[in-house]
Amino acid sequence: MATQEAGKLEWRISVDNGTTERLVPRSGLSKRIFLWLKDLVMKVIMERVAKFMRKAWRIGADDPAKVVHCLKVGLALSLVSIFYYMRPLYDGVGGNAMWAIMTVVVVFESNVGATFCKCVNRVVATILAGSLGIAVHWVATQSGKAEVFVIGCSVFLFAFAATYSRFVPSFKARFDYGAMIFILTFSLVSVGGYRVDKLVELAQQRVSTIAIGTSICIIITVFFCPIWAGSQLHRLIERNLEKLADSLDGCVAEYFKENEVSTNRNEDENTNMKLQGFKCVLNSKGTEEAMPLIRFSGFSFSQANLARWEPAHGSFNFRHPWKLYVKIGAAMRRCAYCLENLSICINYETEAPDQVKNHFGEACMKLSSASSKILRELADMMKNTRKSSKMDFLVFDMNSAVQELQETLKNVPIETNKPEEVPSEEENKVDSEERTTSMSLHEVLPVATLVSLLIENAARIQTAVEAVDELANLADFEQDSKKKTGDNNTKQPPLSS
């Protein structure tokens, strides 16, 4: 039965209970394919969104400082935008409140040092370039028809000088961003002043908006959950010293351990992580010195340079010797290169005879233990910012272990006992004595390489000790007043002549 309802024709059928049901036509093949594709696309999109949200949550959970930085940026922008919303404040800066917002976006960084660096560079460069631009504009207006020539020559000369200064390493390390802002501001003021009547008033308004933006950034980054670049660098040095000690102990212990199959998977993973600890020290060079830690507009600043911009905080004074952290990091990386070669010795295809391993094992383990104790003591000095009262004894123990290992190296066994199998009892009775065979060079070479690397690593650790001692003296670390007890107290370090 067909009925017409609201201009549409529909078909109904009668069922057993006396009612009718509407017949719905089956969807075509193209429509079913469209619905299937729609569901597939929505499923893929939802999976991607869920994956992105999980990744974003994991990043924030691993490093809450990133979340804090985002909140601080939002707070700074909210405060500076008041100058744009409120008419009295907006008129007070001559309608240029947007420059304050742009300043916050550009200069706000993840730690105090980077924010201070960019704020000071931006303010000083803007004031200096604006003043020079106004002076050049005045000179150009007094020159009559040569106005365009004067402006063009001044732009060329100042742009050349500022750009060339960015290639000077000492200048680039601290004022690279300021040089770029100087070029930009000077060009805008000097060239733009050719078509602007109230140039001085415009320059004053721009400077005031930049001052407002940088002031808000400095206040928020210092007084609201501050993240100090100096503290981050200090903790990085401390952690790397601990990782070097663990890696040194792990490499030597792994080489001299007996060949046993371990059944504890978690223990193997933990041991492998300690063995690879030296890689963290090698990769941290970018954070300490050379590789870009914070990038903006193509520029990079090292962690030590950023720390120099920060005010006094915690146990760090205003003129804290941050340059020495780069020196300490370089000394640690030299130790890490030795450990990298030590880890290669573990994977040598040529196995040294057990007799040779037993000959060197005790002396190598003793030197490894003495060296790792020094590294851990250095880490403890950095952690507590205190001078060590037992460092001289630990260095004396390490030097004694080096001498002992060198003496052991002079008495390398050149022959090894190898009993030969005999085919018959008669031959066994005739020749029952063990025969000696000489060892080849490639059998002794792995252990000799290990020994030389341990001795070289001890010398490099001595360099790290000197660098940390220099830092402790210049930074006025407190003297360790705790009375040290143990076996080391009975020993006396060698007297210096």
Swiss-Prot record:
Subcellular location, record wording: Membrane
Keyword DNA-binding: no
A Pfam family recorded for this sequence: ALMT
Membrane topology summary: Multi-pass membrane protein
Keyword line: Ion channel, Ion transport, Membrane, Transmembrane, Transmembrane helix, Transport
Basic and acidic residues bias (residue ranges): 417-436
Biased composition (Polar residues): 487-497
Region (Disordered): 413-437, 476-497
Listed GO biological process terms: malate transport; monoatomic ion transmembrane transport
Transmembrane segments: 66-86, 88-108, 123-143, 148-168, 173-193, 210-230
GO CC terms, sorted: plant-type vacuole membrane
Chief localization: membrane
Coiled coil, from the record: none
Similarity section: Belongs to the aromatic acid exporter (TC 2.A.85) family.
Function: Malate transporter.
Protein name per its UniProtKB record: Aluminum-activated malate transporter 10
Source species: Arabidopsis thaliana (Mouse-ear cress)
